Amino acid sequence: MKENKSLQEWLGYAEQIQEDANKIILGQEKAIKLIVISLLARGHVLLEGGVGVGKTTLLQVITKLIGGEYERVEGTVDLMPNDIIYHASINAEGKPNISKGPLLKKGEDLSVFFFNEINRARPQVHSLLLRAMTEKSISAFNKDIYLPNMVVFADRNQVEKNETFELPAAARDRFMMEISIETPKDKALRDSIIFNSRFQDTSKLVKDIPIAN
């Protein structure tokens, strides 16, 4: 996203993203509008909605339209804070290998970071993420790595209550919006999503979007 735009240009830019996204993601006009607002305001978002309503695809589409990079991490009870910063492994020669994790992999190009089922991760992971959200940086590899364009989207597992760690009110206050993603009520839209072959391969759907300038 270019920074040197007039207010009118930003408005046109936002409207164009919404228009393009609505051609790809059906029945989510309100959610798309709110997500675009949050991205332009650099405000983090809690997403509400069941499994399979298309949250991942929606965020991938929006990321492609605005330009920048997308990363996702899955919340589990085994996830540790370091897991989202770096990966440690042993290479073929038996030597340790350290690589950047999902939060740092794309560096300053990271636009959208999706934390799926955040309430399944431990509070220590929440603390690290909330600090990165506030400071827009992470200290790792003996230096500060800045994430100036990162907007965090997170959703919660609202079905399983075992081994979940709900966000306290103070943590939820770090999110600018809570946006509901629901299955479209219009039967024609639902039929199109289910039966139109264009929407069956979501990876191709996202890949075919032209890269934003």
What does each model-found stretch correspond to?
Residues 79-95:
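Conserved NTP-binding/hydrolysis module of P-loop NTPases
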Residues 8-53:
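Pre-Walker A (pre-P-loop) alpha-helix and adjacent loop at the N terminus of AAA/AAA+ ATPase modules
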Residues 36-77, 89:
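Walker A/P-loop
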Residues 91-94, 117-128, 133-213:
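Canonical AAA+ ATPase core
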Residues 34-37, 91-114:
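Conserved alpha-helical scaffold flanking the Walker A/P-loop in AAA+ ATPase domains
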Residues 47, 114-115:
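Hydrophobic anchor at the beta1->P-loop junction of P-loop NTPases
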Residues 33, 40-42, 66, 107-109, ...:
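Short loop/turn elements that form and flank the Walker-type P-loop nucleotide-binding site
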Residues 27, 47, 84, 129, ...:
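Residue-level signature of catalytic and energy-coupling elements of molecular machines
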